[in-house]
Amino acid sequence: MSETVDPVVRTASPSPAAFHYGPAHLIMHGNAAFLAAFGRGSLGMPAREVMTELPRSAFELMDRVYREGRPLARRLVLPGGEHRLVVVPRADPESGDVYGVTTHLRAQGPPVHPEEETNP
């Protein structure tokens, strides 16, 4: 999700999207699909405590984007099939300091074997 994408489009997306704050990736906002998947109780909680079905590599990707300040994507194999996780840094426009990340998780098609997980 980039800064140029209309917030209404992100909110209306049928795929889970969320804004995570700080190095603990506290969930500050989720679209309807995210809240349907993880519940309103997820707001304010660290992503690692809420999004337990995601593999460790998803959180490593979020950490890397937060640390390096550049967007990255990764294919993940989840129980529902193959998904693409896109993580984009959110930074202060004046200082450039990263204060959070946005995530967008979308299904990619038929299931694949876990050993086929790769970086895009």
What are these regions (language model features)?
Residues 34-45:
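PAS/PAS-like sensory domain cap-loop motif
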Residues 110-120:
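Sensory-domain boundary/capping and coupling elements
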Residues 50-77:
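Terminal output helix/cap of sensory domains in signal transduction proteins
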Residues 18-20, 60-62, 87-88:
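Aromatic/pi-system hotspot detector in well-structured domains
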Residues 85-101, 109:
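Short loop/turn elements at sensory-signaling interfaces that couple input to output
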Residues 1-36, 119-120:
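Sensory modules in modular signal-transduction proteins
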Residues 104:
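Sensory beta-strand/linker motifs that couple input domains to effectors
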Residues 74, 81-85:
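PAS and PAS-like sensory/regulatory domains
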